[in-house]
């Protein structure tokens, strides 16, 4: 192992869902800086255009697709493979909804599960086929510390349940594909300063509790999550599969 290049992704082609914004976009920045070619996937065409313009020559293709559509993910994988063999998949697309369980409507529950769980499986299955056939690949899933603990003071049963499912899906695929050369791992971020958490961070009754319960006393930055994703996708993690890597400022050590 060459320690000078072990975190590089030169020659790799990485497909990233949710690539148009937030942590997904930050992961694209990290991968591009490390030499990867990128397949950007997002349901928002305008967000993809902005991301592609920023990332420039690193972008091999941009695909407008909704992860909740299984057929769209199959088509996206085929389109991506026609450009270059995809050796890395990052499942970053995700949503969160705050709600009390007794007041949760069916549509909200189904939407969260459709994006966070179904979408991750559809994408993993679609891109995993070629990886398994080639005998090589790495998948990085965006889980959450919410898949391990119960958040407070806010309630979000659908989000927590979905991220618990993400962690188990990660382990299941890791076990199934380990002997076929494909590694599958997940990140479990804590509270991160993204657009998705902005409205919650502006509520003192939530934000102050978050900081009090985080040993490091602050939110994470998207770049800190992207750096962890880079590790899991890179040759540096060649003997790592089925891991749920906490990147939460120590929140889950309590």
From Swiss-Prot:
Q: Which UniProt keywords apply?
A: Magnesium, Metal-binding, NAD, Nucleotide-binding, Oxidoreductase
Q: Which residues form the active site?
A: 159
Q: What is its EC number?
A: 1.1.1.406
What is this enzyme's catalytic activity, as reactions?
galactitol + NAD(+) = keto-L-tagatose + NADH + H(+)
Task: Share the entry's pH-dependence remark.
Answer: Optimum pH is 10.5 with 1,2-hexanediol as substrate. Optimum pH is 4.0 with acetoin as substrate.
Q: Name one GO molecular function term.
A: oxidoreductase activity, acting on the CH-OH group of donors, NAD or NADP as acceptor
Q: What cofactors are annotated for this protein?
A: a divalent metal cation
Question: What up-regulates or down-regulates this gene?
Answer: Constitutively expressed.
Note on cofactor: Can use Mg(2+), Mn(2+), Ni(2+) or Co(2+).
Q: Where does Mg(2+) bind?
A: 254
In terms of Pfam families, this protein maps to: adh_short_C2 (PF13561)
Summarize where NAD(+) binds, as residue positions. Answer: 21-23, 42, 66-67, 159, 163, 192-194
Q: How is it used?
A: The wide substrate spectrum and the stereoselective mode of action make GDH a very interesting enzyme for the production of optically pure building blocks in the chemical synthesis of bioactive compounds. GDH could be covalently immobilized via thiol bonds onto the surface of a gold electrode, which represents a proof-of-concept for the development of reactors for electrochemical synthon preparation using dehydrogenases.
Q: What does this protein do?
A: Catalyzes the interconversion of galactitol to the rare sugar L-tagatose. Shows activity with a wide range of substrates, and catalyzes the oxidation of a variety of polyvalent aliphatic alcohols and polyols to the corresponding ketones and ketoses, respectively, and in the reverse reaction, it reduces ketones with high stereoselectivity yielding the corresponding S-configurated alcohols. Shows high activity with D-threitol, xylitol, 1,2-hexanediol, 1,2-pentanediol, 2-hexanol, L-erythrulose, D-ribulose and acetoin. Specific for NAD(+).
Family under the similarity heading: Belongs to the short-chain dehydrogenases/reductases (SDR) family.
| The protein's name | Galactitol 2-dehydrogenase (L-tagatose-forming)
């Amino acid at each position: 192992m060459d320690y000078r290049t072990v975190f590089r992704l030169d020659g790799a082609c990485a497909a990233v869902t949710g690539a148009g914004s937030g942590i997904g976009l930050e992961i694209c920045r990290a991968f591009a800086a490390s030499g990867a070619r990128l397949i950007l996937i997002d349901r928002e065409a305008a967000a993809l255009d902005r991301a592609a313009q920023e990332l420039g020559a690193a972008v091999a293709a941009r695909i407008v697709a909704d992860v909740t559509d299984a057929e769209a993910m199959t088509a996206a994988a085929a389109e991506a493979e026609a450009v270059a063999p995809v050796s890395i998949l990052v499942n970053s697309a995700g949503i969160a909804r705050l709600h009390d369980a007794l007041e949760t409507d069916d549509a909200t529950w189904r939407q969260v599960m459709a994006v966070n769980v179904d979408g991750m499986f559809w994408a993993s299955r679609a891109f995993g086929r070629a990886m398994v056939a080639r005998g090589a690949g790495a998948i990085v899933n965006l889980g959450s510390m919410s898949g391990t603990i119960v958040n407070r003071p806010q309630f979000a049963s659908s989000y927590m349940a979905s991220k618990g499912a993400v962690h188990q899906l990660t382990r299941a695929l890791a076990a199934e594909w380990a002997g076929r050369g494909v590694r599958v791992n997940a990140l479990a971020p804590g509270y991160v300063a993204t657009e998705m958490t902005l409205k919650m961070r502006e509520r003192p009754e939530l934000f102050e509790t978050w900081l009090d319960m985080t040993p490091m006393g602050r939110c994470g930055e998207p770049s800190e999550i992207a750096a962890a994703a880079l590790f899991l996708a890179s040759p540096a993690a060649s003997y790592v599969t089925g891991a749920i890597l906490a990147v939460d400022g120590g929140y889950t050590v309590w």
